[in-house]
Amino acid sequence: MQEYYLNSEKKICLMELSEFKELEGAYPHKRNLFRSMNPVQYCKAESYGDCLFGTMKIPRALKGRVTYIVFGFYLRGEELLLIEDGSFLKTCLGRLEKIIPTECSMHQFLVMIFEMLIEDDVIYLQQQEEKLASIEEELLKKIPEHFYEIILQYRKRFSAYHAYYEQLVNLADAMQSDFGQILTDKERSLWQLYANRVERLHDHVELLREYLVQIRELYQSLIDVQQNKVMSILTV
């Protein structure tokens, strides 16, 4: 377990799931979070009184396949627990240490982590759009082999990101509604800005999915034209 301090009162603990299981002290609903992490199913946040906890499941496309980074979080008072068996959060915390404002609340810090998770997603989605445009251009020149396998990879990828952003929108809404009374105006504003940004990413994925459908329809129309030519030759 590693400990980080925003100041003398605000503590962040980074630990593995096994360490969280054995953690002693007053952590209401700890068992609920532990169950939610075996395994992590999706992004969510739950609140009970002054206790907030949840899980994150972040898709990452690697060599055509979708993999996931998962972790849990538990916030109570001035203590934030981050639970992960990998090294992703350690890297995030190392970066955040350099940019944390002098007066930073725990909710602000949590938003900063969530913002870091999506900071490069706009670029990634733009790259996906460019790749689809290239596929469309090549399709007009020559019908490629294994077209459906290629399209299937993109469809799985976009479905994963579509679900992810939808979950993040719900999570941000829950943060504002369930904790609205104890959040400061600045904290509410940060969560709203985060929700707006995620909604734009969600809309971008929607457009990519529609673009993919158009490419598939173009492919089918080209196949139909090709088959009609063959049939006309055979008929003659």
What does each model-found stretch correspond to?
Residues Q108-L132:
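Well-ordered alpha/beta subsegment
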